[in-house]
């Protein structure tokens, strides 16, 4: 992987990631394909929304279908027929999400397989092996996602263990002679001093990119913004920065304002299935009865297949009838909205009008622009 940084405006960055499987223009949003599919979409449909890179889930793909089935096909690209780049998370967040059914030790994590109840163990080395078999273009280190809330001492112990796991991940990745990219994950909860230690430790180990983890786990937005404002300036300029599991359109804009290059989130796909559709002025709840007779498209500014062909009334009808097509059309629209948003952000940075873009973005939502410290 090669990262090129073309232009900056304030802390916002315009660049690109180059892989053997294709180029990713940044800032970029990655749709989530947890089980080797973006729910309800073919790879061709996902590509048509403008997506350049997908996220796959190491934990879930390890449990089902497993490494052997994956290797029979070649790797995850061959299995799901997505031939662009793929980033895989390490499984750390999913293990964190298991709650009381898991036991974390220095060696790794013992837990019950949520599929069949079997006892299972995952550690840094196993995560690297699974991601190697998946053929991930970007591999994530194995870490512990620090929960919120956490005391300073709890966050410190969690972050320090993640650093030790980061070194183990790096060692095993190098031992495999994996030709792809390996990203470190910064932890430390909402504590700036712990984030500093994490950044120092990870940059000393050395990675191809750096993710900010442990955010969007329940903390107030102000804390997320504060941690990003504090952390991003410390990261190497020549390496990509990835904000994990974020988020709403506003979160993407705020992340870019603070120096983030990459995002992923289930929000556009999950919200689509629940009838929450993102448009230029905010959100349309298609289940609202006022849309029953509305013959206009979701968003007159949108060029997606859904908006070019169907009315709000039709989407309302499909939702009321629980038709699968409704979820698919909604998903196409939401994914395209996110990609259009990222393309607009990239153009604005290129043309030195990102500040104006931000003002217009919030004006369309009748909201004030959130403050940006140390801009």
UniProtKB/Swiss-Prot annotation:
It comes from Photobacterium profundum (strain SS9). Homodimer. Within each dimer, one monomer is responsible for RNA recognition and catalysis, while the other monomer binds to the replacement base PreQ1. Its EC number is 2.4.2.29. One of its GO terms (molecular function) is tRNA-guanosine(34) queuine transglycosylase activity. Its cofactor is Zn(2+). It catalyses: 7-aminomethyl-7-carbaguanine + guanosine(34) in tRNA = 7-aminomethyl-7-carbaguanosine(34) in tRNA + guanine. NCBIfam families: Q_tRNA_tgt, tgt_general. The lineage of its organism: Bacteria, Pseudomonadati, Pseudomonadota, Gammaproteobacteria, Vibrionales. InterPro entries: ArchSynthase1/Queuine_TRR, TGT, TGT-like_sf, tRNA_ribo_trans-like. This is Queuine tRNA-ribosyltransferase. Residues 245-251, 269-273 are annotated as: RNA binding. Disulfide bonds: none annotated. Substrate binds at residues 89-93, 143, 187, 214. SUPFAM superfamilies: tRNA-guanine transglycosylase.
